[in-house]
């Protein structure tokens, strides 16, 4: 894992070197300056005159150092020429050797992170910066269809994991999930659309409109909004898999049997688009898909749109509905799922040695984010303030976390810097913790690295009760985080009976809910591809 400057500098150096070499000609040890076009400015001429290219790696190093003075870039593009940008020089290395090489470079990544920590002085954002607050929430989950019911079930330690009933899964080794048993779009989505849309879109539209209702945004209130500054950013990891699956089945008979809406209703962006069309909102509108980190990416980007003045109001979050044959089969093929079919409520077990995989869930979570003065002007109830967040990439493996937790640590450190708070101010963390050995342990180690022995800190995993909602996980867990701030109660970790070795259980919430006066709360979400995200909420003051 490298710092931000390296992540931008390395590709830039590659192209700059290629460009300079293409216009220069070298032989032996001679040096020739890059020629300028006849119309070039004198300042550019002086700058580019530094970019001399000679044969051998030393000249390339000089070029990188003189033209693009990025510390991490010169560190990773050293005398071994440019092959380090793309991988090992040896083509004979097998997969395991290549992965070991990547892990071996983690020391460099950690060094860059230390540089980041030294540079990131905790500073409060300028007073003139627009503040972002949460004024509404909507959910569709296996534990409830509104934030209050959902969180009350979490506080009671109730599990939403059960036998799958939506289709016959008797031939699958996994037959359990966090399936939503009773779902209705009545009053939220037109019946005609309900019959045609994928369930992920129905969850999204329903949760989005419920967030507006929860925020007191009636038709009369919305009439006062500047709709060019109202946006929707609700993502999905998998999109309309059921619509696509049904289209394939229809195509086996004839293309004439296919749903004419199968293409638009399968894309991940169409949910946000349909909600904006329904509301007439003309501000930022798109979707993000970063696997299980999707929701946090959407929430942070939405907040940034508000901070930059591009929007006053944003509906943001995530939605996924993949408890269907192709979705279940895909994760079974990955050997990622729990097979505790005879005791489904005990299947999701973050930080417990008796885990045997994660449990799929489904649903949607949507936050109504609003610029503070906009919210105050209309008399909105403010649930919490959004302080900041961060994204990073492990750049290591498709599904496994970085062995040093470098990407997660860097993400948390940057989130704290973005929020302008110290690590001591965080006393609640809603962890990603999916009930997989590698993921649970690496996240715990990253938290221990970042926060040390803070006796006030409490950590829990919402997934212990609802399973993993994939692209919707972060948003639903953000709702749980905001509810913890509002109520002063944090929900338990269920099924934590035999903690992993090295895990300090004093850090983790026990089997019962606990009272906690939250100063600031961190919510983590990580996704396949090494996507890391951390967002921070606090009580509004």
UniProtKB/Swiss-Prot annotation:
Lineage, uppermost ranks: Eukaryota, Viridiplantae, Streptophyta, Embryophyta, Tracheophyta
Keyword tags: Acyltransferase, Chloroplast, Developmental protein, Fatty acid biosynthesis, Fatty acid metabolism, Lipid biosynthesis, Lipid metabolism, Plastid, Transferase, Transit peptide
Alphabetical list of Pfam families matching this protein: ketoacyl-synt, Ketoacyl-synt_C
Family the entry assigns: Belongs to the thiolase-like superfamily. Beta-ketoacyl-ACP synthases family.
Identification of the protein by name: 3-oxoacyl-[acyl-carrier-protein] synthase II, chloroplastic
Function as written in the Swiss-Prot or TrEMBL entry: Essential protein that catalyzes the condensation reaction of fatty acid synthesis by the addition to an acyl acceptor of two carbons from malonyl-ACP. Confers resistance to low temperatures by maintaining chloroplast membranes integrity. Involved in the regulation of fatty acids ratios during seed metabolism. Required for embryo development, especially at the transition from the globular to the heart stage.
Annotated transit peptide: 1-103
Gene: KAS2
Transmembrane regions listed in the UniProt entry: none
E.C. no: 2.3.1.41
Subcellular location: Plastid, Chloroplast stroma
Highest taxon of source: Eukaryota
């Amino acid at each position: 894992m490298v710092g931000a400057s390296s992540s931008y500098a390395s590709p830039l150096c590659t192209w700059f070197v290629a460009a300079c070499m293409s216009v220069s000609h070298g032989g032996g040890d001679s040096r020739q300056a890059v020629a300028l076009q006849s119309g070039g400015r004198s300042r550019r001429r002086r700058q580019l005159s530094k970019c001399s290219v000679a044969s051998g790696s030393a000249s390339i190093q000089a070029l990188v150092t003189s033209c693009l003075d990025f510390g991490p870039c010169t560190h990773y593009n050293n005398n071994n020429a440019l092959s380090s940008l793309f991988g090992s020089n040896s083509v004979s290395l097998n997969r395991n050797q290549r992965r070991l090489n990547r892990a071996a470079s983690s020391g460099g990544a950690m060094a860059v992170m230390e540089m980041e920590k030294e540079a990131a002085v905790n500073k409060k954002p300028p007073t003139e910066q627009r503040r972002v607050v949460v004024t509404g929430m909507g959910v569709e989950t296996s534990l409830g269809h509104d934030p209050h019911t959902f969180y009350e079930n979490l506080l009671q330690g109730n599990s939403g994991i059960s036998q799958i009933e939506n289709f016959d899964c008797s031939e699958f080794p996994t037959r359990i999930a966090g399936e939503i048993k009773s779902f209705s779009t009545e009053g939220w989505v037109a019946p005609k659309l309900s019959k045609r849309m994928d369930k992920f879109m129905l969850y999204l539209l329903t949760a989005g409109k419920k967030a507006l209702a929860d925020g007191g945004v009636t038709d009369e209130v919305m009439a006062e909004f500047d709709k060019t500054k109202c946006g929707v950013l609700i993502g999905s990891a998998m999109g309309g898999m059921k619509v696509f699956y049904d289209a394939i089945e229809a195509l086996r008979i004839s293309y004439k049997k296919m749903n004419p809406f199968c293409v638009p209703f399968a894309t991940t962006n169409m949910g946000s688009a349909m909600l904006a069309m329904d509301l007439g909102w003309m501000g930022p509108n798109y979707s993000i898909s970063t696997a299980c980190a999707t929701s946090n990416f959407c929430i942070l980007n939405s907040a940034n749109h508000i901070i930059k003045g591009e929007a006053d109001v944003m509906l943001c979050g995530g939605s996924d509905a993949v408890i269907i044959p192709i979705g279940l089969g895909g994760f079974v093929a990955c050997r990622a799922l729990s097979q505790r079919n005879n005791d489904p409520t005990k299947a999701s077990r973050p930080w417990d040695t008796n885990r045997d995989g994660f449990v799929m869930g489904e649903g949607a979570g949507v936050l109504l984010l609003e610029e503070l003065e906009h919210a105050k002007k209309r008399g909105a109830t403010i649930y919490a303030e959004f302080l900041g967040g961060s994204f990073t990439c492990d750049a290591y493996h498709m599904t496994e976390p970085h062995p040093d937790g470098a990407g997660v640590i860097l993400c948390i450190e940057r989130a704290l810097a973005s929020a302008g708070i110290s690590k001591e101010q965080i006393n609640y963390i809603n962890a990603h913790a999916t009930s997989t050995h590698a993921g649970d342990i690496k996240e715990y180690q990253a938290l221990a690295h970042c926060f040390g022995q803070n006796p006030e800190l409490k950590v829990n995993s919402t997934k212990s009760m609802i399973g993993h909602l994939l692209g919707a996980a972060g948003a639903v867990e953000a709702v749980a985080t905001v509810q913890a701030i509002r109520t002063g109660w944090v929900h338990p970790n269920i099924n934590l009976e035999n903690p992993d070795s090295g895990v300090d259980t004093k850090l983790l919430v026990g089997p019962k809910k606990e009272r906690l006066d939250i100063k600031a709360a961190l919510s983590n979400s990580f996704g396949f591809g090494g996507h890391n995200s951390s967002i921070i909420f606090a009580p509004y003051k």
